[in-house]
């Protein structure tokens, strides 16, 4: 049971908001160039009675690298609800996650990797995450990879998402999700398990490159360069480039309709993975295409 809770928690992190009263607004910059550097964006216009906000997260990040600035806190305070990729305060989330964690067809990691790669990954998983591979080998490989992110980051990671849930609860605000646990877990049934398993082997066999790429992503994130971060994410050595439409673009498109309805109802703070913000099919570009003014906020 303890092992299961640990696995579900890490996987959750991976999959890892217009009022009648006046609002104190974070200071938005005057212009909105597509390549402006910010993780926090104000969305206004198109009949909205008050702004909403979009923030780009890293689902797992070292506590020392988290930036909970006053403009970010103010954006949450200004909003009447907090909306993330998933409804993170749903009490049934762990149960839903558990129900969808396993590979279909009874497949296991041992069947998907060579004997050498399986042995190396098993030793690595035990050393870095304290997990016996024979106990978790039926879990979808992408989710198993989440168990190793603390080792790649070099810390016990924190989560913007859990922080925003806490802030929302303290401020008596509703937390909602743009998609369901089933939506997210279902994505990893559409990517061949063999390809996901290769990623696990690469995490061990190319550990240095993995850590270097993670530090590069983190550097771009801390510099708030959302366009460059998007470009690196879609070209990642350890990513799934040919599945960018499945993992990013198609999801962005689905989210926009929900985001429009939520923002029209009341000012909303949206928090999604930063890789979803940039690019011609990113959330920011799609909101502009729908006629909204999208401005970077000094963060």
Short names for language-model regions:
Residues 1-9:
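Bacterial N-terminal signal peptides that target proteins for export
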Residues 23-49:
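N- or domain-start disorder-to-order transition segments that initiate the globular core
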Residues 34, 47, 76, 262-264:
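Extracellular/periplasmic catalytic domains that process cell-envelope and extracellular macromolecules
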Residues 35, 64, 250-254:
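Short secondary-structure boundary/capping elements
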Residues 39-247:
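Structured, acidic catalytic/metal-binding patches in enzyme active sites
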Residues 241-299:
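A cross-kingdom marker for long, charged
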């Amino acid at each position: 049971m303890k092992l299961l809770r640990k696995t579900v928690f890490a996987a959750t992190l991976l999959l890892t908001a217009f009022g009648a009263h006046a609002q104190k607004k974070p200071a938005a910059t005057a212009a909105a160039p597509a390549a402006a550097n910010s993780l926090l964006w104000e969305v206004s216009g198109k009949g909205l009675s008050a702004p909403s906000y979009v923030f780009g997260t890293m689902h797992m990040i070292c506590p020392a690298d988290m930036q909970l600035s006053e403009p970010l806190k103010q954006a949450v305070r200004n909003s009447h609800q907090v909306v993330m990729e998933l409804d993170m305060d749903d009490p049934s989330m762990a149960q839903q996650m558990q129900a969808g964690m396993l590979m279909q067809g009874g497949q296991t990691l041992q069947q998907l990797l060579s004997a050498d790669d399986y042995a190396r990954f098993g030793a690595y998983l035990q050393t870095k995450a304290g997990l016996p591979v024979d106990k978790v080998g039926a879990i979808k490989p992408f989710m198993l990879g989440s168990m190793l992110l603390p080792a790649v980051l070099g810390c016990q990671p924190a989560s913007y998402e859990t922080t925003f849930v806490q802030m929302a609860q303290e401020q008596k605000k509703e937390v909602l999700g743009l998609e369901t646990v089933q939506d997210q877990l279902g994505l990893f049934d559409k990517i061949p398990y063999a390809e996901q398993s290769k990623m696990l082997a690469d995490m061990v066999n190319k550990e240095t490159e993995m850590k270097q790429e993670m530090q590069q992503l983190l550097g771009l994130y801390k510099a708030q360069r959302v366009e460059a971060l998007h470009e690196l994410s879609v070209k990642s050595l350890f990513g799934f480039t040919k599945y960018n439409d499945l993992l990013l673009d198609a999801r962005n498109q689905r989210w926009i309709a929900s985001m429009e309805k939520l923002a029209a109802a009341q000012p909303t703070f949206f928090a999604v993975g930063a890789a979803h913000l940039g690019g011609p099919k990113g959330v920011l570009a799609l909101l502009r295409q729908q006629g909204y003014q999208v401005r970077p906020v000094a963060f």
